[in-house]
Amino acid sequence: MHRTTIPLIVAVLTVSVALRCMGQDTESLPAREAKAASIDELLLFFPSKFPDGEWKPKDLQFQDVFFVAEDETKLHGWYCPANAPRAVVLVAHGNAGHVASRAPWLRFLQTKAKVSVFMFDYRGYGRSEGTPTVEGALRDAKAARAKLCELAAIKDTEMLLMGESLGGAIVIQLAADSPPRGLILQSTFSSLRDVADVHYPKLSWLVPGNKLDSATQIVRYRGPLLQSHGNVDRTIPFSSGEKLFRSANEPKQFVTIEHADHNNWVTDAYLNQLDRFLARVSEAQK
């Protein structure tokens, strides 16, 4: 999750409080102003757009994939098939950047982890059209999952779901609706309200309690889980990750990444655990 999220949240929520105190309903504001007070669109999403970034990375074999969400929003992602893959993985990234900014991670998954991977951009990110919202991101993920079924010629229950930070909350919803072969979460929160309680407790009541309530949704998923979190994460508290993990069903594994903040969780120790998890899930499928 983008580090500047927190001060931005405080600023916009303060405006929201002021409007309520003055008796002005944000629903009555013009569309542009109402969006300016939208927690979903301005406080959670920090998209980067094409052509910013390196869109022709070296040593990564990928296909540009264009597809549409249920509401006809045009979306884009990179499909990176591996030779003789041991698994197929759908990846939902965090709330900043785009697929091109994750090229090194995609390269690792394809060449080292030996999995075929499809990473998509939420609406408003990269080459995907539209404006990002929570509801839209969930629709986008659902459409991406269906597209990966087509690309890899598999059922949705045969793929693994992987999510980083915000992306973890997105794939938890997918897993709750239709269980995948396995679920991999990195630096993911228990709920948006819980994060708000830590960073701005006096204003956290403005965040709906059911907004990305992953701890409640993950109860509906029954299958293998690998969850990891840096123990000095200053963006999503380590305790939030622990709370999410406690809510999950077995079989599950929690990996504490020592001395890791929110974005530097890719360590040799974690990659070793990821490799073992992929091996177990792949073997169980045979």
Feature roles, as predicted:
Residues 21-66:
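An N-terminal hydrophobic leader/cap segment in hydrolases
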Residues 70-147:
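Membrane-embedded segments
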Residues 105, 214, 223, 237-246:
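Short alpha-helix in the alpha/beta-hydrolase fold that links the catalytic acid
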Residues 154-165:
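Alpha/beta-hydrolase fold nucleophile elbow
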Residues 168-223, 267:
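Hydrolase active-site cap/lid region
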Residues 220-222, 227-229, 233:
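Short beta-strand/loop motif that positions the catalytic acidic residue
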Residues 231-236, 263-264:
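Acidic catalytic loop of the alpha/beta-hydrolase fold
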Residues 242-286:
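C-terminal catalytic histidine-bearing segment of alpha/beta-hydrolase fold enzymes
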